[in-house]
């Protein structure tokens, strides 16, 4: 794949999956514009702020004139119903759903021919652990936003989402139960996600839009019941 002279916007691109996506695009010749709250040689500010989004979009267009690919990757806050305040829940939705929506709206007049948006959701958009409501709601929201935008932007921009499962951003190689429990036989790493992002932005994915692709080593496809197929529930006594 060749992304020479393509302009890529990535939210949350300073570390983890976002940084890997940025590096892979750069290797293939793209110009990458990152916004993140973490310090670095990119646009540093808060994605939950409307004026910040407007200034960032203005800077990108003034400098590059157009956008080829928008990758909404920024990580929303994860807190549960016991501890999450109203303000924290709203913040998670602002970063995880409102910012992707508003950046899409701001860039809409400036998307180049063949443009694509990839939203990073999570396998938590379809399954949950206790005390993760803010994150889960944001990830479910962006998965739904994906197919809505795909229809609204039909003929102009393809819009897809990816739902990662367990992705170890330190590239740790796990053995034993952590690996064996995964149908794929291992824990994921950022390249598993970055490679799909590149594919979805390429011409090879030209007939794919409105889709959510779960990359989780098959974990969400397993039926897990105590005593079945070697699975055992061990309940911790409180």
Range-by-range predicted roles:
Residues 104, 138, 146:
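Active-site helix of classical SDR
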Residues 209-238:
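Short C-terminal tail/terminal secondary-structure segment
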Residues 161, 176-208, 215-217, 238:
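C-terminal helical subdomain
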Residues 73-78, 218:
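Conserved NAD(P)H cofactor-binding loop of Rossmann-fold oxidoreductase domains
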Residues 109, 150-155, 206:
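Alpha-helical segment proximal to the catalytic Tyr-Lys
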Residues 80-91, 178:
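Substrate-binding pocket helix/loop in short-chain dehydrogenase/reductase
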Residues 122:
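Residue(s) in the substrate-gating loop at a strand-loop-helix junction
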